[in-house]
Amino acid sequence: MASSSSSLAFSLSLLLALILCFSPTQSYKTIGKGYRLVSIEESPDGGFIGYLQVKQKNKIYGSDITTLRLFVKHETDSRLRVHITDAKQQRWEVPYNLLPREQPPQVGKVIGKSRKSPITVQEISGSELIFSYTTDPFTFAVKRRSNHETLFNTTSSLVFKDQYLEISTSLPKEASLYGLGENSQANGIKLVPNEPYTLYTEDVSAINLNTDLYGSHPMYMDLRNVGGKAYAHAVLLLNSNGMDVFYRGDSLTYKVIGGVFDFYFIAGPSPLNVVDQYTQLIGRPAPMPYWSLGFHQCRWGYHNLSVVEDVVDNYKKAKIPLDVIWNDDDHMDGHKDFTLNPVAYPRAKLLAFLDKIHKIGMKYIVINDPGIGVNASYGTFQRAMAADVFIKYEGKPFLAQVWPGPVYFPDFLNPKTVSWWGDEIKRFHDLVPIDGLWIDMNEVSNFCSGLCTIPEGKQCPSGEGPGWVCCLDCKNITKTRWDDPPYKINATGVVAPVGFKTIATSATHYNGVREYDAHSIYGFSETIATHKGLLNVQGKRPFILSRSTFVGSGQYAAHWTGDNQGTWQSLQVSISTMLNFGIFGVPMVGSDICGFYPQPTEELCNRWIEVGAFYPFSRDHANYYSPRQELYQWDTVADSARNALGMRYKILPFLYTLNYEAHMTGAPIARPLFFSFPEYTECYGNSRQFLLGSSFMISPVLEQGKTEVEALFPPGSWYHMFDMTQAVVSKNGKRVTLPAPLNFVNVHLYQNTILPTQQGGLISKDARTTPFSLVIAFPAGASEGYATGKLYLDEDELPEMKLGNGQSTYVDFYASVGNGTMKMWSQVKEGKFALSKGWVIEKVSVLGLRGAGQVSEIQINGSPMTKKIEVSSKEHTYVIGLEDEEENKSVMVEVRGLEMLVGKDFNMSWKMGIN
């Protein structure tokens, strides 16, 4: 469950850190004198292998590793890998079976002919990225061939010890950096100099700003404007060990407590190119079922099935869309995974309820935590013990405490665990036909710290007071260097011990892997096992929501941003967190709408649903101890929900097409403005607005008491989606103050776009059966223009999202205006599926046409229209208009009553009267 213990846990960690008197993380200007390159070899696979010798040993943070092996390879035209490890012994790396990628040559294997002692600067050139190096001391730089910019330049000494690795790069001050998460960034999406960015998965509430949270993504995007042209690149340090990354504006320093340096440099040069190339490496985002793009409702505290039934009924009565109803652990028997409470959720009644909602297209999802209750009569525990699947400490299962009380944690690096987990999912699915799984507390969260035993003679937990207070008998574990490493990362923002409120870092996984190394991939490994289990059981496209994430998690799961607050600041922060996860390759993301705790105000919940209706993953979720906050609880919030979610359900075909685009190219569903306008530097720090796709912009109210919003409009024409006669024309880009009364959100569509929509509905299944419309946006008042759009449709629960299976259709839409003629046409790939559904385009709305809007000689597929249709035109009004008054007149033309088949190529044209 989304743990309400988070704020308490954070306070306890702070107190413990103060009690134990942990000194602040030490900062050394220089640790040693680095390494020299003593030889370099060319390998048959096109890479280069070098050997580095330490120049001067020291004992700061441990002994230096004397000899290092350098491996450099241009893996693709746009990706360069730089891998540095111990030359003599294999070191921990992110497992290749979890994150498949090319493996460097084996350590110690000599390849090729050595070129001894080259003292001059050398270069290894690729298509776009150039690797250059010096030999004594060894440094390296990565440059872009096309504009000669240095992207990465190791200016200070390389440090490589068993438990401390350090490397730095210089940066131009004009660079804009994004990423290095998961982190709630109070200052927005753009990284702020002189803030430490700690990467180590923790159950720390997202209300705690600028600290390490649930996921670890050691990747950043660097966007620079060079001579008026934008260039973006990315740097990934693929390492699962805890690390601090210090960004000082003109430099960036990594301080890592284990593993290897495994750098990947991604060339770009556009932000979209970057995520395409990045997800080509880490895995394309998972395809999501259509229903998952609908609205979701959850709460910790739906005490029995009757409450859940009432929630579903009340959404229907309020005419607020709802696709998915969720259970936190209220459905469980004693908080135990894969169980059902026989009193609160009797199986027969639950099955009848699920049969009812499944028939109308609704879905049901429940929570699952990794901790398995230590209970001899509990079947899941019995089978786990028999299969020997738990993480060990000194040969015995490591004991912790979570909601069921004493628990053991499954080791998802063990193949036997994956099989056992899949079997438990099947058993539960046979018991309750769930439609997805929500995996929580998988950082891993533990209510205790250290080595614990179950107390004799007393119940744990006692059943009195909060369930998150540790009731085991525990003692600190500091006897090994894995529990007390020489360098203290800034864990939880207070330099807490790395094993605090989680698994002891000297515990062991399969094949002797230490928790110290594998800690931050626990949630990732659980996600992969859960995905495999659901796929095998359902045979459908899995839907998984995970709190903890790592590099590559987006290939399997969606993410929500954890335990946020019902505050205006949490609302603001939700946008930058969402945008960061799009860059990380996890595009299906959102925050708890209205906040997890405490109770939001009515005004805040109004404004939050106006933002959250456009999160890729849109869910209202609340804490056990907070008052009810379903969207129908306030009349004004219900109005805002019907308005904002009504728009979401109309654009579901567009969102689903973005889901397909994300799966094929990694493109985020929700994007910062600079993704579409990288040359417009005003966008670089904007975290108060966002785009869906390339051209659908949301400009919400984010402050209390405001009834207008100042929105940034990049250059071009923008049309309001709630009243398409309203337009903003921004020649060079400008900020515009727009009215935004309580139940109103500003949503604009950019020029040169064709947007497919449907009529909406209260459930996505119903909305999907309605006729299509196309909104075509040209530059306002243009006598010539061009627009494009896309539409992807399929049988949405098929495991794969692709063309070629006979159950999907892809359409490219085009439109042009010129010489007094408006034309639009489609090019359909594999139209059979769309034709089988009978989908038609019933209406076309064309925005920005120059003139009076007179329409004549409408033709479809080369023949005059004989069917009676309705044509109307309205003149645009401008919030900010064209500067040339003679061109200031433009119109919206709508043609209704069409029956153009989505699954068949068509062309349509008409003549226009121009005044």
UniProtKB/Swiss-Prot annotation:
<dbReference type="GO" id="GO:0046556">
    <property type="term" value="F:alpha-L-arabinofuranosidase activity"/>
</dbReference>
<dbReference type="Pfam" id="PF13802">
    <property type="entry name" value="Gal_mutarotas_2"/>
</dbReference>
<dbReference type="InterPro" id="IPR000322">
    <property type="entry name" value="Glyco_hydro_31_TIM"/>
</dbReference>
<feature type="active site" description="Proton donor">
    <location>
        <position position="563"/>
    </location>
</feature>
<dbReference type="GO" id="GO:0030246">
    <property type="term" value="F:carbohydrate binding"/>
</dbReference>
<protein>
    <recommendedName>
        <fullName>Alpha-xylosidase 1</fullName>
        <ecNumber>3.2.1.177</ecNumber>
    </recommendedName>
</protein>
<keyword id="KW-0964">Secreted</keyword>
<keyword id="KW-0326">Glycosidase</keyword>
<dbReference type="GO" id="GO:0080176">
    <property type="term" value="F:xyloglucan 1,6-alpha-xylosidase activity"/>
</dbReference>
<dbReference type="GO" id="GO:0061634">
    <property type="term" value="F:alpha-D-xyloside xylohydrolase"/>
</dbReference>
<dbReference type="GO" id="GO:0045493">
    <property type="term" value="P:xylan catabolic process"/>
</dbReference>
<dbReference type="GO" id="GO:0009506">
    <property type="term" value="C:plasmodesma"/>
</dbReference>
<feature type="active site">
    <location>
        <position position="440"/>
    </location>
</feature>
<dbReference type="InterPro" id="IPR025887">
    <property type="entry name" value="Glyco_hydro_31_N_dom"/>
</dbReference>
<keyword id="KW-0119">Carbohydrate metabolism</keyword>
<feature type="glycosylation site" description="N-linked (GlcNAc...) asparagine">
    <location>
        <position position="153"/>
    </location>
</feature>
<dbReference type="Pfam" id="PF21365">
    <property type="entry name" value="Glyco_hydro_31_3rd"/>
</dbReference>
<keyword id="KW-0732">Signal</keyword>
<dbReference type="GO" id="GO:0071555">
    <property type="term" value="P:cell wall organization"/>
</dbReference>
<dbReference type="InterPro" id="IPR011013">
    <property type="entry name" value="Gal_mutarotase_sf_dom"/>
</dbReference>
<dbReference type="GO" id="GO:0009505">
    <property type="term" value="C:plant-type cell wall"/>
</dbReference>
<keyword id="KW-0325">Glycoprotein</keyword>
<comment type="function">
    <text>Glycoside hydrolase releasing xylosyl residues from xyloglucan oligosaccharides at the non-reducing end. Has alpha-xylosidase activity against xylan oligosaccharides. Also has alpha-glucosidase activity against p-nitrophenyl-alpha-D-glucopyranoside. No activity against p-nitrophenyl-D-xyloside.</text>
</comment>
<dbReference type="InterPro" id="IPR030458">
    <property type="entry name" value="Glyco_hydro_31_AS"/>
</dbReference>
<dbReference type="GO" id="GO:0005739">
    <property type="term" value="C:mitochondrion"/>
</dbReference>
<dbReference type="GO" id="GO:0046686">
    <property type="term" value="P:response to cadmium ion"/>
</dbReference>
<feature type="glycosylation site" description="N-linked (GlcNAc...) asparagine">
    <location>
        <position position="304"/>
    </location>
</feature>
<feature type="glycosylation site" description="N-linked (GlcNAc...) asparagine">
    <location>
        <position position="375"/>
    </location>
</feature>
<feature type="glycosylation site" description="N-linked (GlcNAc...) asparagine">
    <location>
        <position position="490"/>
    </location>
</feature>
<keyword id="KW-0624">Polysaccharide degradation</keyword>
<dbReference type="InterPro" id="IPR013780">
    <property type="entry name" value="Glyco_hydro_b"/>
</dbReference>
<dbReference type="GO" id="GO:0009044">
    <property type="term" value="F:xylan 1,4-beta-xylosidase activity"/>
</dbReference>
<dbReference type="InterPro" id="IPR048395">
    <property type="entry name" value="Glyco_hydro_31_C"/>
</dbReference>
<feature type="glycosylation site" description="N-linked (GlcNAc...) asparagine">
    <location>
        <position position="888"/>
    </location>
</feature>
<feature type="active site">
    <location>
        <position position="443"/>
    </location>
</feature>
<keyword id="KW-0961">Cell wall biogenesis/degradation</keyword>
<dbReference type="GO" id="GO:0010411">
    <property type="term" value="P:xyloglucan metabolic process"/>
</dbReference>
<keyword id="KW-0052">Apoplast</keyword>
<dbReference type="InterPro" id="IPR017853">
    <property type="entry name" value="Glycoside_hydrolase_SF"/>
</dbReference>
<comment type="similarity">
    <text>Belongs to the glycosyl hydrolase 31 family.</text>
</comment>
<keyword id="KW-0134">Cell wall</keyword>
<feature type="signal peptide">
    <location>
        <begin position="1"/>
        <end position="27"/>
    </location>
</feature>
